Curated annotation (Swiss-Prot):
Name of the gene this protein is made from: dapB
Pathway: Amino-acid biosynthesis; L-lysine biosynthesis via DAP pathway; (S)-tetrahydrodipicolinate from L-aspartate: step 4/4
NCBIfam families: dapB
Ligand binding (NAD(+)): G8, A9, L10, G11, R12, M13, D34, G102, T103, T104, S128, Q129, N130, Y131
Upper classification of the organism: Archaea, Methanobacteriati, Methanobacteriota, Methanomada group, Methanococci
KW Amino-acid biosynthesis (keyword) present: yes
An example Gene Ontology biological process: lysine biosynthetic process via diaminopimelate
Record's protein name: 4-hydroxy-tetrahydrodipicolinate reductase
Alphabetized InterPro entries for the sequence: DapB_C, DapB_N, DapB_N_CS, DHDPR_bac, NAD(P)-bd_dom_sf
Species whose genome carries this gene: Methanococcus maripaludis (strain C6 / ATCC BAA-1332)
EC number: 1.17.1.8
Enzyme class at the top of the EC tree: oxidoreductase
């Protein structure tokens, strides 16, 4: 039985992961953690997420080290925000706890700080902007399209719910990274357009971020040239697709000794 701690336990992703862990053979929720001074601290996380009592009380991130030690957690799952996630990763890795990280919005410095802690403490971690299986097939397909349609104009469009705090999305940035790594030409990433921009240059890859309503996550990459347009789209209609992917990542990383992995590793797409 793999003992799992979940941060952001009452968030949209955290609560979904907790529910699915309780339905998954071989996994057990041993700690549920949320922000300091949370008003529901000390209440049963099962009752808070509609499962009924499961015997795990909500704790807070200011007591993370003690919670991880007392619970014996082997894997910690973090879908929160960049700054607290870095601190969580540093604490967990110091204690030898493996990680599944789905948080987005890291600065390069934050990402480097987190990866340094993981490497120095010789734990294993999967880090991904999107754990949905379909979106990773989307990423893999982008490798081929960028290689074969590298002389086309390329634009990226992403849409999310009005509550999303970072833009562009981590998934859109990952798509852009994959495209740039597979183009046989120079490229320049830009974000939206405004005013008199002049003609579009061949090097431009532009990301457009839309926000509104309850959109879980839509991503489209458009390859266009004179006479034709190819669009590759992925749409998440339920967070359960992300939750299911995170569960796979927990199972994958649980028995790994050390290393930093991504969802291509989890899904054997490399």
């Amino acid at each position: 039985m793999v003992k799992v701690a979940v941060t952001g336990a009452l968030g949209r992703m955290g609560s979904g992961i907790i529910k699915t862990i309780t339905e998954t053979d071989g996994l057990d929720v041993v700690a549920a953690i949320d922000i300091p001074n949370h008003p529901k601290k000390g209440l049963d996380i099962g009752e808070l997420t509609g499962l009924g009592k499961i015997g795990v009380l909500l704790s807070t991130s200011d007591e993370l080290e003690d919670v991880l030690k007392e619970s014996g957690a082997e894997v910690l799952v973090d879908f929160t925000a960049a700054a607290p996630c870095v601190n969580t990763a540093k604490t967990a890795s110091k204690l030898g706890v493996n990680l599944v990280i789905g948080t987005t919005g890291f600065t390069p410095e934050q990402r480097a700080e987190m990866e340094k802690a993981i490497s120095e403490n010789k734990v294993a971690a999967t880090i991904s902007q999107n754990y949905a299986v379909g979106v990773n097939i989307f990423f893999k397909t982008l490798e081929l399209l960028a290689q074969k349609l590298g002389d086309y104009d390329i634009e990226i469009l992403e849409m999310h719910h009005k509550f999303k705090k970072d833009a562009p999305s981590g998934t859109a940035l990952r798509a852009a990274e994959i495209i740039q790594n597979n183009l046989n030409r120079d490229s320049n990433l830009i974000y939206g357009r405004e005013g008199i921009t002049g003609e579009r240059t061949k090097e431009e890859i532009c990301i457009h971020a839309l926000r509104g309503g309850d959109i879980v996550g839509d991503h489209t990459v458009i390859f266009t040239t004179e006479g034709e347009r190819l669009e590759l789209s992925h749409r998440v209609t339920s967070r359960q697709s992300l939750v299911s992917g995170a569960i796979r990542a927990i199972q994958f990383v649980a028995d790994k000794k050390e290393g930093i992995y991504n969802t291509f590793d989890v899904l054997d797409l490399n």
